């Protein structure tokens, strides 16, 4: 059975584990309709468009 040759310090152990839990920035793409950044494959929160169609009616547009 494998046995560690030396004790691994807490800082060495934690710095190794830190690579596992690293967060990545969200991948944003511009909305083709209004050019605001949005998550890919999701409805634009600004204009409500997805793949050239209105999916969400905003309150300002619905009142008109």
Curated annotation (Swiss-Prot):
Region annotated Disordered sits at 1-21
**In which domain of life is the source organism classified?**
Bacteria
Give the family this protein belongs to, as stated in its UniProt record. Answer: Belongs to the bacterial ribosomal protein bL32 family.
Q: Is Cytoplasm one of the keywords UniProt gives this record?
A: no
Q: Which InterPro entries match?
A: Ribosomal_bL32, Ribosomal_bL32_bact, Ribosomal_zn-bd
A GO cellular component term found in this entry reads: large ribosomal subunit
List the source organism: Symbiobacterium thermophilum (strain DSM 24528 / JCM 14929 / IAM 14863 / T)
One GO BP = translation
GO molecular function annotation: structural constituent of ribosome
Q: What is this protein called?
A: Large ribosomal subunit protein bL32
HAMAP family in the cross-refs: Ribosomal_bL32
Q: Where is the composition biased (Basic residues)?
A: 1-15
Supply the alphabetized keyword list: Ribonucleoprotein, Ribosomal protein
């Amino acid at each position: 059975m494998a046995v560690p040759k030396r004790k691994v310090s807490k800082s060495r152990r934690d710095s190794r584990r830190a690579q596992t839990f690293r967060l990545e920035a969200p991948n944003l793409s511009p909305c083709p309709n209004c050019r605001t950044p949005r998550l890919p494959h999701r409805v634009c929160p600004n204009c409500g468009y997805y793949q050239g169609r209105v999916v969400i009616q905003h309150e300002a547009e619905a009142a008109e």
